[in-house]
């Protein structure tokens, strides 16, 4: 309780919800060849490499960071951070802006923000829970490893849920049940 939640920015969808991505591509006039505003193709954005964090985690541990929990944010989206065993509330105050790919998927599938953040990483790739006293040093080490990170939120006493304040979204523990 009281831990900071540090998010690392994602590089893309990380091979999750591929069926939904495929369905979205079929609805685009040019499919995977649809151009994004940065000049990349939709298909290239889908295939963005997944970041690997083994060296980063080792560096954090070597620098004395007291990591309490780590999770990737894939398949269940941001809801995945409540997979920790304890009954706690995860309050997200700050999030990365989703990549354009996610906005396109949302526009052609008509999914709500709640559906999108509950399915995709929406720009958040990895969550690291550390004591508040370690946040600054954690962010520094992450940046040294060439990743972007933010102090996204805090773990609080309460029922098992994730609250994404900037989007006014709340997920209860029941939303992690298999669909």
Residue ranges and their predicted role:
Residues 1-35, 162:
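Phosphate/diphosphate-binding glycine-rich loops and adjacent basic-rich segments that engage nucleotide
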Residues 9-20, 45-52, 73:
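Short, contiguous, pocket-lining structural segments
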Residues 38-43, 51-179:
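Glycine-/charge-enriched secondary-structure boundary and capping motifs
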